[in-house]
Amino acid sequence: MAFKKNLASSKDDNISDWYTEVISKGNLIHYSNIKGFMSFLPNGWKIWQLIKKELTKEFDQRDILELCLPSLISQNDFLLEKKHLEGFAPELFIVTKTSNETEKYILRPTSEIAFCNLWRETLRNYRQLPIKHNQWTSVFRVEKNTRPFLRNSEFFWHEIHSCFETEEQSNDFAVDIWKLYQRFIKDILCIPLVAGEKTEAEKFAGAKTTYTVETIMPDGQALQSATSHNLSQNFSKAFDIRYQTKNNDYQNVFSMSAGVSTRIIGAIIMTHGDDDGLVFPTKVAPYHISLNCIFDDTNQELNAKLKELANKYSQKYRVHLNVNKDSTGEIIKNSQLRGDCCVLLMGPNDLKKNEIVFIDRITKQKQFINLDHLDQKLEELFSTFDQKLYQKAKAVFETKVDFAQTFEEFEQKIASGKFVRVFYCNEDLYEKQIKEKTGASSRCIIKYLDEQTQERCFISNKKAKVEIYFARSY
């Protein structure tokens, strides 16, 4: 007998409708009356705060200092470095009038310019280097086709901006942060990934090198989930950021930037959610345990016991206590929609038997657990929960990754929703043709081939220079 699912939409049949429904019924956000803007509801914001907590631990170990910079950028400053911010021009929010001032201002689409202005005015000599800064903030980019978390006109992120004495130091730190992102996405968020370098056509225009982390959604589309950029001296020369060296001469700094945004919440939802609702890895789940009274919410002894359990387990887990008179079915449904890792139910008869009903989010199987064994049961659940999530996601991931030798194969596999690995000559001309013909873009270079390679490019038949992934993307 098939049980009715909590959602009307099926993730397998129509992931777009499913995504819209699961976000709404999971109470993560509220749509604003301004296109592309949304309010984070408490559970949605809690996820972002938990992501922030995990990443901040890593940043603190690297002596990255947190600060906060202004939201407005002078349009004159923006035009000064327009070529390095290419791609933002058509999607800017511009403040056209401020009191009697004639100069226009831009709501930041990113903060390289703000950091450059700060460093130019405060950096004096080599003793201040390296500078490692980070801010948690929102940025603004006009979007025509918006989806909550995946594509918003205002979104939240963290952005690291750092500067160094040498190119090697700048690149090494960019790579270190890139590897940190890979560990975070794989080990904490339980999402399989592909990592590599962006092509010249796809990298951040102001970067010498862009390192990316790409995740693959269940429909085969790629989601750029984190990037780290070696900016070399591109910004420091444009903004004249110089410091006095040990030799008493002056040199431009080398800089890098990196970031992860609330888009990663969309990746978590699409990777782990199911037709009953949201599912979250333990480190970022708003609630680990939903603890509920059933059948008799006026029973003082029962309520006292539930509060005792809530106080006990709140020392280790995030607990949602519910002593309202909801039906058992409604309690389980709401817990699954919300993405609680497990739901615990206790009624008067359970109290007499010294037991509790236990349902975990992954298996959804109902078990009766003696309260004397509940500690052990929870330990067992949370010691394997993330591993099970990752293995489930990895199984889907492996069905979406494929290889193509020829362009004909490539077209077929892209059309069927695959994340396709190919050998490629790495020339911008062909990248544009590929996008026009298939809708796929290059996602990341995973390997540079040596001169002796016998591999041929899948589209030009020229000698291949790289091994690379292409996919359609969000």
Curated annotation (Swiss-Prot):
Keywords: Aminoacyl-tRNA synthetase, ATP-binding, Cytoplasm, Ligase, Nucleotide-binding, Protein biosynthesis. Its main location: cytoplasm. It catalyses: tRNA(Pro) + L-proline + ATP = L-prolyl-tRNA(Pro) + AMP + diphosphate. PROSITE patterns: AA_TRNA_LIGASE_II. The keyword Nucleotide-binding applies. Its EC number is 6.1.1.15. One of its GO terms (molecular function) is ATP binding. It holds the Pfam family HGTP_anticodon. Signal peptide: none annotated. CDD domains: ProRS_core_arch_euk. GO terms for biological process: prolyl-tRNA aminoacylation. It comes from the Bacteria. It is found in: Cytoplasm. GO terms for cellular component: aminoacyl-tRNA synthetase multienzyme complex; cytoplasm. Belongs to the class-II aminoacyl-tRNA synthetase family. ProS type 3 subfamily. Consists of three domains: the N-terminal catalytic domain, the anticodon-binding domain and the C-terminal extension. Catalyzes the attachment of proline to tRNA(Pro) in a two-step reaction: proline is first activated by ATP to form Pro-AMP and then transferred to the acceptor end of tRNA(Pro). Homodimer. This is Proline--tRNA ligase.
